[in-house]
Amino acid sequence: MEKIWKEMYDAAKAVLNARQITEYVSCGEVAAAVCSKSGRIYTGVCVDTACTLGVCAERNAIFNMLTCGEQEIDKVLCIMPDGSNGAPCGACRELMVQLMADKYQDVEIMQDFAAERIVKLGDLTPEWWIK
């Protein structure tokens, strides 16, 4: 496995911090790391609200990447509360596809860090609804 995956896992784990902000808002139960094409790692946590205005950890990390002036994603990893990994939800996949419409197929997604199982976004999202 490439060294960058360990760096991403550690970066996401460092911000994984589940907490209740108010009776309506919680955050940090899921954390994500996105590696841009430049090799820089951006992190984010999920924000859950009582009225569905929350955001997934992956999108939060992508928004941090965009805030810092980058827009090309190379790798994505998310960590669940138990330390396991999972695939991005449909909304997160859609954002990645729209950001990289002609290149999204090659974005790497960590499915299982312990087993070193990596898939391509193109395998998870083989046909984009717009094209």
Question: Could you say what each language-model-derived stretch is?
Answer:
Residues 1-22, 70-131:
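C-terminal binding/interaction regions
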Residues 26-36:
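Short beta-strand scaffold segments in enzyme catalytic cores
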Residues 27, 56, 71-73:
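Short connector loops at helix/strand junctions that flank enzyme active sites
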Residues 40-41:
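Hydrophobic "anchor" residues
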Residues 45-59:
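Compact, glycine-rich, soluble single-domain proteins
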Residues 60, 64, 88:
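Feature captures the catalytic cores and cofactor-binding loops of soluble hydro-lyases/lyases
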Residues 64-70:
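Alpha-helix C-terminal capping segments
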